[in-house]
C-alpha cells in the first residue's frame, strides 16, 4: 500500500510539474504588460457559445477585461480592410484561414512568434511568418436531412459530382462567397481538385441547384434538421453540433467519396492592435489546453491541432477521420483567393442574383 501511495504521489507531482511547465512557458513580463493594458477586444468567427467561453476563461485567468463580437470570417476581413491598420479589435479567433491569409498578404496581421506554437502538430498549422496560428481542423462535407430525402425518393449524394444532378435542384444550401470563409474554401477546393477552369465551371453548374447562400459558413447546418435545407455544404463539426446539442438525429453526415479539403481554424493579432501585449497573451492562451480543451463542452467539435490537447470524443464517434483529406495548397489559397472569388462571381454573371445580397 505504501508503495502504491508513493507511486501515485510521484505521478501526481509529475503531472503537476507538467501543467506548471506549460503555463510557465509564457513570459512573466508579457503577462504583467498585458495586465497593465487591462483590456482586449476580440472578433470571433467560431460559434458564439465557444467564443463567449474562451473570452470568459481568459478574463478569469488573467483579470483582463475582454469585449467580443461574433462575425463571419468574411465580415471580419471586410471590416479590417476598411479600417486599414487602425483596427477596432485586437485579435481574431476562429474561422477558416483563407480570409486570414488574404489579410496577412495585405499586411493587416501582426507577425508574432508564439512560444506555445511548439505544441502544434506540424508546420502546416501555422503561418510561416507567425501571422496566424491554427487551433483546430474541420472537415468539409455535406449534411443531409435523411427523412426529407427519403420522403422525396432521393438518394443521399456521396460525392461532389452528385450535387450537380438535376434532382437536387433547389435543395442545396451553401454559404456566400463574399462573406464566408467556408465558401472561399469551397472555391479553392474545387479549383485545386478539378483545375482552374473546370473548378469554376463546376461552381457555375452547382449554382443551378443552390436554393440559398447564407452569410455565415455554419448557416446551412442550422437549417438541415428542420428540413428547410435538405442538403447543406459546410463543415461536418457544425452538423455534429446540430445532432448532439440540438437533437436532430435526422441529419446524416457525408465525407465526399473522391476526397475533400479541410479548414484550419486560426487565431491572429491585427496590425496596429491597441492592446498589443494582451493580444500576444491571447495567442499564447489560444494555443493552450486552457482554451481549446473547453471547445467540445461548448458545442465546437473540431479536431484539435495541439499535442497537449484532448481530442473531442464526438468527432471520433461519427467516424470522421482528420487525415482523410486532400493535400490542400495553402500557399495558392493565400495568393489567389480574392482573385478566384472575383472570377467565380464574374462567371456566374446574371446568376449572381439576390441570393448573394449581404444586407
Give the location of each predicted region.
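Short, low-complexity disordered leader/linker segments with a strong preference
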Residues: 1-37, 354-359
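Alpha-helical segments flanking ligand/cofactor-binding loops in enzyme cores
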Residues: 32, 161, 221-222, 280, ...
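A short alpha-helix/helix-coil micro-patch that ends at or immediately precedes a cysteine
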Residues: 54-62
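Mature extracytoplasmic/periplasmic domains
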Residues: 260-328
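Conserved C-terminal helix/tail region of periplasmic/extracytoplasmic solute-binding proteins
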Residues: 320-359
Amino acid at each position: 500500500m505504501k508503495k502504491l501511495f508513493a507511486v501515485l504521489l510521484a505521478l501526481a507531482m509529475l503531472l503537476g510539474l507538467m501543467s506548471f511547465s506549460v503555463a510557465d512557458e509564457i513570459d512573466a513580463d508579457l503577462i504583467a504588460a498585458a495586465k497593465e493594458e487591462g483590456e482586449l477586444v476580440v472578433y470571433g468567427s467560431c460559434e458564439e457559445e465557444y467564443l463567449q467561453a474562451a473570452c470568459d476563461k481568459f478574463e478569469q485567468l488573467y483579470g483582463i477585461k475582454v469585449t467580443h463580437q461574433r462575425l463571419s470570417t468574411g465580415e471580419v476581413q471586410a471590416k479590417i480592410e476598411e479600417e486599414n491598420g487602425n483596427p477596432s479589435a485586437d485579435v481574431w479567433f476562429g474561422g477558416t484561414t483563407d480570409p486570414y491569409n488574404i489579410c496577412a498578404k495585405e499586411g493587416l496581421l501582426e507577425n508574432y512568434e508564439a512560444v506555445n506554437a511548439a505544441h502544434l502538430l506540424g508546420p502546416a498549422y501555422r503561418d510561416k511568418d507567425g501571422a496566424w496560428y491554427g487551433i483546430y481542423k474541420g472537415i468539409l462535407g455535406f449534411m443531409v436531412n435523411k427523412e426529407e430525402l427519403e420522403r422525396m425518393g432521393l438518394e443521399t449524394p456521396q460525392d461532389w459530382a452528385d450535387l450537380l444532378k438535376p434532382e437536387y435542384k433547389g435543395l442545396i444550401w451553401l454559404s456566400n462567397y463574399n462573406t464566408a470563409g467556408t465558401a472561399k474554401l469551397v472555391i479553392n477546393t474545387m479549383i485545386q481538385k478539378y483545375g482552374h477552369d473546370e473548378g469554376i465551371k463546376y461552381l457555375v453548374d452547382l449554382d443551378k441547384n443552390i436554393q440559398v447562400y447564407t452569410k455565415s459558413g455554419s448557416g446551412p447546418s442550422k437549417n438541415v434538421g428542420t428540413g428547410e435545407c435538405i442538403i447543406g455544404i459546410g463543415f461536418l463539426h457544425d452538423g455534429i453540433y446540430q445532432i448532439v446539442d440540438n437533437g436532430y438525429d435526422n441529419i446524416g453526415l457525408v465525407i465526399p467519396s473522391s476526397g475533400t479539403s479541410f479548414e484550419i481554424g486560426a487565431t491572429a493579432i491585427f496590425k496596429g492592435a491597441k492592446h498589443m501585449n494582451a493580444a500576444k497573451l491571447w495567442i499564447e492562451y489560444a494555443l493552450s489546453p486552457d482554451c481549446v480543451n473547453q471547445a467540445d463542452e461548448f458545442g465546437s467539435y473540431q479536431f484539435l491541432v495541439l499535442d497537449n490537447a484532448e481530442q473531442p470524443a464526438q468527432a471520433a464517434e461519427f467516424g470522421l477521420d482528420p487525415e482523410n483529406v486532400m493535400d490542400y495548397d495553402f500557399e495558392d489559397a493565400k495568393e489567389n483567393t480574392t482573385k478566384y472569388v472575383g472570377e467565380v462571381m464574374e462567371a456566374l454573371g446574371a446568376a449572381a442574383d439576390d441570393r448573394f445580397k449581404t444586407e
